[in-house]
Regions:
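Short alpha-helical transmembrane segments in multi-pass integral membrane proteins
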Residues: 1-16, 70-137, 183-239, 292-300, ...
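Helix-loop-helix hairpin linking two adjacent transmembrane segments in secondary transporters
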Residues: 135-138, 146, 150, 155-203
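Transmembrane helical elements of multi-pass membrane transporters/channels
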Residues: 11-30, 131, 135, 165, ...
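Transmembrane alpha-helical core residues of multi-pass small-molecule transporters
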Residues: 49-52, 96, 161-169, 194-202, ...
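Small-residue-rich hydrophobic transmembrane alpha-helices
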Residues: 42-102, 139-158, 257, 266-310
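Transmembrane alpha-helix boundary and packing residues in multipass membrane permease domains
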Residues: 16, 20, 31-32, 49, ...
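Helix-terminus/linker motif at the lipid-water interface of multi-pass membrane proteins
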Residues: 25-43, 112-119, 175-186, 243-276, ...
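Hydrophobic transmembrane alpha-helices of multi-pass small-molecule transporters
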Residues: 54-57, 169-173, 203-207, 276-279, ...
Length: 371
């Protein structure tokens, strides 16, 4: 029988999980449209994935920090504090990501070559990556705004906004990739331009919803010492985990890209299929983070135990295993995926062991340490 803790958890988890599922299915439609143009266009679009995720690593870390802080204040009395955290984080994200995006733009071609791009499709990759950088910036700002909604458990609202934005993305991409009527066919550049407009829509829609909920009330956008005192310890720990995992994924993807455009295109399609499960289950991780954060604010050890979630990242192991299977045994793309399977098994084992150690310490004691 489902108890009240389970119902609260599922109310947050299911919309977040289905949002991830809808988003990856729509993204798959996107990849299918690009795929009709050939293997080189798939490789050109996919080679930008890791630079994009490196940029999002910073905004996601900040957004997760915002969610954890806001979830502890997730009631009407805490709305003013949540609003202040959101607005100051928006300023930090706009400035930090703005500088990073400028650096990426200035050295974009070198970055793509570093990621494993070849002269066969570098021009296509540049056509896609320049507008895709703009879309990534809009996504980063949206993540900060939606972090507040997530902190309040409003995953259904996030789902509706993101799915609407991605439907717009699919429609615009179809028009701009293939061309309809007076609109010329733009190929991979059209896919990126469609994403720019879709991400801008999601940003504006999210901001409008939060404004209607009163989160843009009178408070300063300028970060102060108190803000940094709250945010930096959380941001630093999350960024270290996110950054370590991203470094491992960059090396992993670079090895796959080094196999050539066609194997890399196949690898990218397979990764997209795997992301169907990954994006779905991530919704449950978000719900665990939110309910655990809310329970910390209430001092409820039991709720934290029900909502406990851990993500233990193994950074060095995957590239080492990938290099061994790829170069040592000469297994090619099969070796890349064998390394991925082993890595995920080890990560799951480590995460379970880590959670058992936390449980042995006692949740109430952990909450007291956090306080």
């Amino acid at each position: 029988m489902t108890n009240s803790y389970d119902k609260s958890y599922l109310k947050i988890a299911l919309p977040a999980a289905f949002e991830g599922l809808f988003m990856i299915l729509l993204a798959s439609t996107d990849l299918i449209m690009v795929g009709t143009l050939g293997a080189f266009p798939i490789a050109a679009v996919s080679i930008f994935a890791q630079p994009r995720l490196v940029l999002l690593c910073f905004s996601r870390s900040l957004a997760s920090s915002v969610t954890l802080l806001v979830s502890r204040k997730a009631d009407e009395a805490g709305k003013e504090a949540a609003s202040s955290i959101m607005k100051k984080s928006l300023t930090v994200c706009a400035l930090l990501l703005g500088m990073l995006h400028i650096l990426f733009f200035l050295f974009l071609e070198d970055i793509l070559y570093l990621m494993g791009a070849t002269p066969d499709y570098i021009s296509l990759a540049m056509d896609y990556s320049v507008p895709a950088l703009i879309a990534t910036y809009f996504t980063s700002l949206t993540l900060i705004l939606q972090a507040v909604q997530l902190g309040y458990g409003k995953t259904a609202v996030i789902m509706k906004t993101n799915v609407a934005g991605n439907i717009i993305n699919v429609i615009l991409n179809f028009i701009l990739i293939f061309g309809i009527g007076p609109v010329p066919a733009m190929g991979v550049a059209g896919a990126a331009i469609g994403t720019v407009f879709a991400t801008l829509f999601t940003l504006i829609a999210t901001a409008a919803i939060l404004r209607g909920d009163g989160f843009f009330a009178e408070s300063s956008y300028v970060p102060d010492k108190d803000y940094f005192r709250q945010i930096l310890p959380i941001f630093g720990s999350i960024l270290s985990e996110q950054g370590s995992e991203r470094a491992g994924m960059v090396i992993f993807s670079r090895m796959a890209a080094g196999l050539g455009p066609i194997p890399f295109a196949i690898h990218s399609v397979c990764m997209n299929i795997c992301d169907i499960y990954w994006d779905f289950i991530t919704g449950f991780g978000k719900a665990s983070m939110v309910t655990a954060g809310q329970s910390c604010g209430r001092g409820s050890g039991r709720t934290a135990e029900v909502a406990a979630y851990s993500f233990f990242s193994v950074t060095l192991l995957r590239p080492i295993m990938t290099g061994l299977f790829l170069y040592g045994f000469g297994l090619g793309l099969t070796g890349v995926w064998m390394a991925l399977v082993l890595d995920q098994m080890i990560r799951a084992t480590c995460a379970i062991y880590f959670m058992r150690k936390l449980k042995a310490r006692g949740w109430d004691r952990i909450l007291a340490d956090m306080a």
